[in-house]
Amino acid sequence: TISRYFTKSRGKALSTGWFGLSTAEFILPVLIVYLLTITSWQNIWISVSILVLIFLPITSYTLIKNLNFDSREEVKETEHKEKDIFQWKRIEVLKDYRFYIICLNMLAMPWIATGVFVYQSFITESKDWGSFVIAQSFMVYSILSVVTLLISGFLIDKFTSRKLLIFMNIPLSLSTLVLIFFDSSMTSFIFLGLIGISNGLANVLGSSTWAEIYGVKHIGSIKALSTALMVFSTAFGTALFGLLIDQGYSIEQIAF
């Protein structure tokens, strides 16, 4: 929706929209750790389920009831105009080689990050970091995700998503090098911090790039396609990580 109805300030709008998720990734781990000291994990899950069932419908209705979906952000004639972009259909996108190249770039983050999150206990034990260290490191991950979100929104509006796309996975690549060559508990913060930077970039670029290249008329179906591939990549990544662990590979070998 944001990609469709924002043009000039799409990057800032997307970064604001993703701000809630990254903030929750910072707050919830701390909150859950505290709640575990006073109640069981079963009670926490029950409470979360009840809160979602009650507040999510109310909040969603309150936020969208006064929205006007017939309007779009106005752009001056002298500035770039999205109406000049050819509006691709999903079947046309599937025939475009650029889609697959971009997808390979975009899917690296969810593919690797999901494996890290699911098997964080294996990484923690292999590196002897300790559960409290990894929990604190996730706070660094969330903080840098938020900071990167806010910065990337302005950069996208200034330079476009296509120019920033090539930088998205550089921090992610550096994080694997950290995992391979360093064992100190301090490197846990660097490791997850670098993943957080790539995550912040990926969240915004994952929506704005498609709108810039393929237009917004069919952005829903195109985004659905890329999201389906993302879900598949996370499932495949998790399975591959598990298989390699069962085969006796070390975390350094997996990262390599």
Where in this protein do the model-derived segments appear?
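Flexible cytoplasmic inter-helical loops of multi-pass small-molecule transporters
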Residues: 64-87
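Helix-loop-helix hairpin linking two adjacent transmembrane segments in secondary transporters
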Residues: 21-68
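Extracytoplasmic gate region of multi-pass secondary transporters
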Residues: 91-152
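Helix-to-loop junctions at the C-terminal end of transmembrane segments
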Residues: 148-160, 245-246
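Structural signature of the two symmetry-related core transmembrane helices
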Residues: 163-178
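Cytoplasmic helix-loop-helix junction between adjacent transmembrane helices
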Residues: 1-19, 215
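Paired small-residue
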Residues: 186-194
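A late C-terminal transmembrane helix in Major Facilitator Superfamily
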Residues: 25, 216-248
